[in-house]
Amino acid sequence: SNRPMPLNLYQFKNMIQCTVPSRSWQDFADYGCYCGKGGSGTPVDDLDRCCQVHDNCYNEAENISGCRPYFKTYSYECTQGTLTCKGDNNACAASVCDCDRLAAICFAGAPYNDANYNIDLKARCN
């Protein structure tokens, strides 16, 4: 699909490129049951668990009045692989930034299993 990427996902993609420069962010866009479109069932591995935690983190952020995590931009910086959320973020932006920052760090520490890329969600993620 060639729909424009929501702005926040553009920032999240850049965060992933900061912590995992050796991989394309697209490797994380369709992985396991939770990375990308999915969001049900049992995570297939540690990396998928990172995405489940990220999904739950966004759900928590939605409890902040008017906060829409997928569209919320925030201010952050990447310095030599270290991500910092900046102090000028409002409550929503700060929460979403931290969700993305923690997920990008989690991705960097989790093994990547090629067999879990683009799996059959219906069969594996009930």
From Swiss-Prot:
Localization (cell): Secreted
InterPro entries reported for this sequence: PLipase_A2 (IPR001211), PLipase_A2_Asp_AS (IPR033112), PLipase_A2_dom (IPR016090), PLipase_A2_dom_sf (IPR036444), PLipase_A2_His_AS (IPR033113)
Tissue: Expressed by the venom gland.
Coiled-coil features, chain-numbered ranges: none
Enzyme active site: 54, 100
Co-factor binding details: Binds 1 Ca(2+) ion.
PANTHER family per the UniProt record, alphabetical: PHOSPHOLIPASE A2, PHOSPHOLIPASE A2 FAMILY MEMBER
Name the UniProt record assigns to this protein: Acidic phospholipase A2 3
